[in-house]
C-alpha cells in the first residue's frame, strides 16, 4: 500500500498521485457476488434533482458486501484482497468452511490465508466480529451496527476506526472518527481493527477529468449565478453578492441540518 507519483509530462499529471495497489491480490471480482445498479444521477422517482453535483462516471459493477457478519461460529479463510470501485476501502473475499463465499470490508493488516470468525466468545483479533459487550475497552473497531441485527452502518470508509470508551448498562460509549461520542446497544456487532487503505486521504486527484470519472459534476458558486437561482446571484460585474454566505434557499452558512430528533438522546458529545 502506497502512493504512486507521475512524471510531469503535462499540466494534468504534474501533481496527480495514484494508489500503487500493491495490496491487491486479484483483479477480477467474484461474479456471483456482483450485481448491476442503475445510476440515479441525483434524481428521485419524479426525475427532479434532489442531490446536486452528481452524474456521469465510469461504469462499474456493485460488489455485494456482508455488513451483518451473521454467519456465526464458522471459520472463514481470506481468499483475496480486492479493489472495490464503489467505496474507498479495500474488500476481502472470504471462503467459509461450508463452502460459501462472502465479501467483507478488509481491515488493515489482514492478509491472504488468514482465518477470521464472527460471533460470541471468539478471540479479539483483527477481522473478527463480536458484540460490543465482549470487546475490551480501548479497542479500535469499525463496521459498527446502530441497532442489533441491523448490519454495520458506522465507520466504513478507508482508514477510519472508532474506539470503545466505556460500557454502562445496556449501552456502550463509542467515540467515532468525527469526535462524536455515541451510545450504542451492547448487543450490536462491530469488527475489530481499522479499515484498510490508510493512504486514501493522501491521494491528490490532480485534474478535473478524474473527478468526472468518479461521477461528480462541477460545483457552481452562488455569486456566479443569476438572481433567480441563488440569493447571492446577479449584480453588475464581479459582485460579492451583498450578503453573508448562504444556501440557495436563503439559510445562513453553517446552520445544523440534522433532522433525526428521536436519536438525539444517544449522542453524548457532538462531533467537532
From Swiss-Prot:
Tell me which GO cellular component terms the UniProt record holds. Answer: large ribosomal subunit
Q: Does the keyword RNA-binding apply?
A: yes
**Which pairs of Cys residues are joined through disulfide bonds in the record?**
none
What SUPFAM superfamilies has UniProt attached to this entry?
Answer: Nucleic acid-binding proteins, Translation proteins SH3-like domain
Q: Does the keyword Ribosomal protein apply?
A: yes
Q: Which family does it belong to?
A: Belongs to the universal ribosomal protein uL2 family.
**In its UniProt entry, what is this protein called?**
Large ribosomal subunit protein uL2
Q: What is the lineage of its organism?
A: Bacteria, Pseudomonadati, Nitrospirota, Thermodesulfovibrionia, Thermodesulfovibrionales
In the UniProt record, the gene name given for this protein reads: rplB
Amino acid at each position: 500500500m502506497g502512493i504512486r507519483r507521475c512524471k510531469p509530462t503535462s499540466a494534468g499529471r504534474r501533481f496527480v498521485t495514484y494508489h500503487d495497489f500493491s495490496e491487491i491480490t486479484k483483479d477480477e471480482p467474484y461474479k456471483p457476488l456482483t450485481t448491476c445498479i442503475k445510476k440515479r444521477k441525483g434524481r428521485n422517482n419524479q426525475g427532479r434533482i434532489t442531490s446536486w453535483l452528481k452524474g456521469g462516471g465510469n461504469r462499474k459493477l456493485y460488489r455485494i458486501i456482508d455488513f451483518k457478519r451473521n454467519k456465526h461460529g464458522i471459520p472463514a479463510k481470506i481468499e483475496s484482497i480486492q479493489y472495490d470501485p464503489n467505496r474507498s476501502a479495500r474488500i476481502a473475499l472470504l471462503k467459509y468452511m461450508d463452502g460459501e463465499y462472502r465479501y467483507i470490508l478488509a481491515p488493515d493488516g489482514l492478509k491472504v490465508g488468514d482465518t477470521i470468525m464472527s460471533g460470541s466468545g471468539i478471540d479479539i483479533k483483527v477481522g473478527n466480529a463480536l458484540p460490543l459487550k465482549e470487546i475490551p475497552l480501548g479497542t479500535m473497531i469499525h463496521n459498527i451496527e446502530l441497532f442489533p441485527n441491523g448490519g454495520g452502518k458506522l465507520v466504513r470508509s478507508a482508514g477510519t476506526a472508532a474506539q470503545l470508551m466505556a460500557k454502562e448498562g445496556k449501552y456502550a460509549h463509542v467515540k467515532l472518527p468525527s469526535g462524536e461520542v455515541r451510545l450504542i446497544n451492547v448487543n450490536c456487532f462491530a469488527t475489530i481493527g481499522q479499515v484498510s487503505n490508510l493512504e486514501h486521504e493522501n491521494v491528490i486527484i490532480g485534474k478535473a477529468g478524474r473527478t468526472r470519472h468518479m461521477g461528480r459534476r462541477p460545483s457552481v458558486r452562488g455569486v456566479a449565478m443569476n438572481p433567480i437561482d441563488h440569493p447571492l446571484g446577479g449584480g453588475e460585474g464581479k459582485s460579492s453578492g451583498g450578503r453573508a454566505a448562504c444556501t440557495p434557499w436563503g439559510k445562513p452558512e453553517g446552520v445544523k441540518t440534522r433532522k433525526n430528533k428521536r436519536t438525539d438522546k444517544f449522542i453524548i458529545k457532538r462531533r467537532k
